[in-house]
Amino acid sequence: MIRQRTLKEIVKTTGVGLHSGRKVTLTLRPAAANTGIIYRRTDVNPPVDFPADPASVRDTMLCTALVNDEGVRISTVEHLNAALAGMGIDNIIVEVDAPEIPIMDGSASPFVYLLQQAGIETQNVPKRFIRIKKPVRFEDGDKWAEFVPFNGFRMDFEIEFNHPAIESDEQRLLFDFSSQGFVREISRARTFGFMRDIEYLQSQNLVLGGSFDNAIVLDDYRILNEEGLRFDNEFVTHKLLDAIGDLYMCGHAIIGEFRAFKSGHGLNNQLLRAVLADQEAWEWTTFEEEEGSPVAFAQPNMVLA
């Protein structure tokens, strides 16, 4: 059968918080089968847990943030959550000693590396997938996102930026999900922002940790980073990476096709909530044979370059 996965060992790293600009220590811990993905704040007493759940997402202004009823929050979870999706991790405790996950280089790649350092442990319990049974769509003005039935996890994502540095023919991306494809084609895409927005936000004591080290920065005409882009379609690829992380807030791999136009964290979350709220739109499924899985996850001992 296709089994649930956790980590073999505890791993730890430090980075900078995007919004606070302060040092953050991140610890990833193995968890028992059926635990799910738990985000934990250890700098509050007692520590506060946030299960990965679309209902925990209560702020999507500049990132995906988990907020509880007392207003305690963990921000910027989407890139790490995308890495967990990419590596097929079902059960994990994610600890931070700050109100946010460190931004690292603005992509999911450092988190993939961290998970590979920890190693993947398979557990003797079936992995539960969410299979989409009928189309579900959510719209917001000219923006929209939808799920339709498909025997795999396919993504069709389009952005629309009228900017000289963002090529018009590099604003749509189709991706058939696999661990290998995620690591090689998606995980290294960095977040991006406009210098005028960053300057304004920093004047409001936001994105104090934002820099050329963790984002693609543009002015009105060009990319300001000396090294340029990692690949030609890095902008749309990062938006697709964000969507992978946002959709994995349900804690389970999805079998279906995700299509989106100009979608962001809020719309991704609204679609996920709409799907799960409709009992006829989805069903649980497991697989007795690895070969029968419509979603290809890396072998636990395989290191993906």
From Swiss-Prot:
PANTHER family: UDP-3-O-ACYL-N-ACETYLGLUCOSAMINE DEACETYLASE 1, MITOCHONDRIAL-RELATED (PTHR33694:SF1). This is UDP-3-O-acyl-N-acetylglucosamine deacetylase. It catalyses: a UDP-3-O-[(3R)-3-hydroxyacyl]-N-acetyl-alpha-D-glucosamine + H2O = a UDP-3-O-[(3R)-3-hydroxyacyl]-alpha-D-glucosamine + acetate. The keyword 4Fe-4S does not apply. Catalyzes the hydrolysis of UDP-3-O-myristoyl-N-acetylglucosamine to form UDP-3-O-myristoylglucosamine and acetate, the committed step in lipid A biosynthesis. Belongs to the LpxC family. Gene3D superfamilies: lpxc deacetylase, domain 1, lpxc deacetylase, domain 2. InterPro entries: Ribosomal_Su5_D2-typ_SF (IPR020568), UDP-acyl_GlcNac_deAcase (IPR004463), UDP-acyl_GlcNac_deAcase_C (IPR011334), UDP-acyl_N-AcGlcN_deAcase_N (IPR015870). Pathway: Glycolipid biosynthesis; lipid IV(A) biosynthesis; lipid IV(A) from (3R)-3-hydroxytetradecanoyl-[acyl-carrier-protein] and UDP-N-acetyl-alpha-D-glucosamine: step 2/6. Keywords: Hydrolase, Lipid A biosynthesis, Lipid biosynthesis, Lipid metabolism, Metal-binding, Zinc. It comes from Vibrio campbellii (strain ATCC BAA-1116). Its EC number is 3.5.1.108. Pfam families: LpxC. One of its GO terms (molecular function) is UDP-3-O-acyl-N-acetylglucosamine deacetylase activity.
